[in-house]
Amino acid sequence: MTVSPVSPAPPAPPTFASLATRLWPLYLSQALATGATTVSTILASLVMADLGSEQLSGLPSTLISLAAALSASSFGVLMLRRGRRIGLGSAFVLGSLGGLLGFAGARWGLTPLFLAGAAGLGAAQGGFQQARYAAAESVPAPVRGLALGVLMLMSVLGSWVMTGFGPQITALSGRLGTGEEVTGWLVGAGLLALAAVMIALWRPLPAASAAGTPASNSDTSQTGAKPSLAESLAAPGVKSTIAALAAAQAVMVTLMSLPPLRAHHMGLEHGSIAGLVSGHIAGMFAFGLLTGPLIDRLGLRFGYVMGGLLLLLAAGTSVTGTRAGLLLSMFVLGLGWNLISLTSSKVLSRWPAAQGPADSLAFAGAALGTLLGGLLMARSGFPALALTAGMLALLPFWAAWRVRG
């Protein structure tokens, strides 16, 4: 009688801690990118005022959103064909060039050149913000929420660290003979160039290897045939996920941009308005280490339902006439966006062909939200804007009904 050899047990999936040692260049590059946008694009309206075009102060933000919407699908295709490292590296290089153009245009008083730089930096955002999919693909499915949460935490750390470098930027501005809002574009260009170096050091781990199964070494972070865009959209829950992501982005950007103006009209000082923005950023990014594991543990429906409820609360409390009410609105607005963004990213990590188009639609929603939201507020008042935002906040509940997992 012969005894069949015992098959060796399959290797255990690697832990997140072991995988994080390979993800640090990706995380650090995202922190650098967030720091770059903190010192550049956020102050674009001030640069336009310096250039004598205060009536067009919102144009750079619109160009940034539109450029990101137009580029996201193209970067998604590039990453599918050539891999995450090449796609993200190209985005960081493009962003660095955009920062240099923006600095040159602002310093020499060339408004078209400055706007070209803003558009270039916006197009880069359409690419490098897809780093979240790379992070999710690099770890096993049960800890993808955690991987995404860490990425969000690194984003807010990058923003906060750069805020602390204000005195150094002021000193550099003095040596260059420019304002801080102009020098920020040069600093941002340098940070994005450094992010490109970080991505060059990154060695993506194939998805199958991240899950603990054998795979060939490639830069695609995927193995086997990938579903096409049509096949991805036909899968249950994908279209509703894209709709939820776009709605959350539109609601977040619109209610983030317009309440500070309303707070100013209420008589709040700049310090109080800055506190509103800080509370919003904390809600967006600071709780990633909590919300990511919660989504892993409680499921995708939890993320969509809780995110939708928080967006509804944000819309409802945004009409308040008190600072406390506005602070609550801005905070839960950020936290609701956090939950929906993490959940949507976890879903779309299984459908690479849909990632670029999803981000394009989200950026387009943000651009339309700020443009049409301002017109609606001027014509019908802020309550009408809040009501519209509340209606859009219902889309995540559709995604919760359709999603699997």
Q: Where in the sequence are the language-model features?
A:
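C-terminal transmembrane helical hairpin of 12-TM major facilitator-type secondary transporters
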Residues: 295, 301-344
